[in-house]
From Swiss-Prot:
Its EC number is 2.7.1.50. GO terms for biological process: thiamine biosynthetic process; thiamine diphosphate biosynthetic process. Pfam families: HK. The gene is thiM. ATP binds at R119, T166. SUPFAM superfamilies: Ribokinase-like. This is Hydroxyethylthiazole kinase. It comes from the Archaea.
């Protein structure tokens, strides 16, 4: 897909500011991923600065990975401000389905905010659609491509958003069309925060293209970077560092050569 390569160049030319209200586990790795790619991260969740910060950000990423009673109010306030300002909002419902707190928080944000992209694994997206038993902790317990296609389509229609269901094959839908992205590597599951980084990278691409193409661009670029990283470092610790390197090194030519993206009409 040519638009993925072009969006990579646009992103680096514009250096979008991505505001992340994310979890303690992944703040550092998420920021490094965005910096390596060519975006500017800010991790800001203080109530008193949200209005100013959201107003200057190119997009807002909300990640509920380390959710508690102190995180929820700034997430909700930022989502309301970003919706009013028509800024792209990307929601990562980490662990939805594992607990009622996570599921209900994600559902509340989906209900009142204008979410551009909902990105999660099979179990998380299934949970916000009311299908239980598919989440193990914050990891997906099972994955079936046909079910993932339907899940992505149904979530997009239900929440009037772009739904990205990630797994061995990623499926992205706006309810009218579906993209399948086959880039990536199983080693990503051995390093914490790779899904969260992907969500924030989608946030960066949301500053330069419409939601469905931003999601496809983010998943493709991160997936290719992971493939290239594993070729040089097949163990978790060095693999993580190499992913940063390839987020920095990836260019239009590599995207055009390595992208495995297919589009289907519904």
């Amino acid at each position: 897909m040519d638009f993925v390569a072009k969006n990579l160049t646009k992103l680096r030319e514009t250096n979008p500011l991505v505001q992340n209200i994310t979890n303690y586990v992944v703040m550092n790795s998420t920021a490094n991923s965005l910096l390596a790619l060519g975006a500017s991260p800010v991790m800001a969740h203080a109530m008193d600065e949200l209005e100013e910060m959201v107003s200057i950000a190119s997009s807002l990423v909300i990640n509920i990975g380390t959710l508690d009673e102190y995180w929820i109010p700034p997430m909700e306030k930022a989502a309301k401000i970003a919706s009013d300002l028509k800024k792209p909002i990307i929601l990562d419902p980490v662990g939805a389905g594992a607990t009622k707190l996570r599921t209900n928080t994600a559902l509340k944000i989906l209900d009142f905010a204008d979410i551009s992209v909902l990105r999660g694994n099979f179990g998380e997206i299934a949970a916000v659609l009311g299908e239980h038993g598919k989440t193990k902790g914050v990891d997906s317990a099972a994955y079936d491509s046909n079910e993932a296609i339907e899940l992505s389509k149904n979530a997009a229609k239900e929440f009037n958003t772009v739904s990205a269901v990630t797994g061995p094959i990623d499926y992205v839908s706006n309810g009218k069309e579906i993209y399948a992205i086959s880039n990536g590597h199983p080693m990503l599951s051995k390093v914490t925060g790779t899904g969260c980084a992907t969500t924030s990278i989608i946030g960066a691409f949301s500053a330069v293209d419409e939601p469905i193409k931003a999601a496809v661009s983010g998943l493709t670029v991160y997936g290719i970077s992971a493939e290239m990283a594993f070729g040089e470092a097949p163990y978790p610790g060095t693999f993580q560092a190499k992913v940063y390197d390839w987020l920095y090194r990836i260019d239009e030519e590599l995207v055009l050569e390595k992208a495995k993206v297919n589009k289907f009409e519904i």
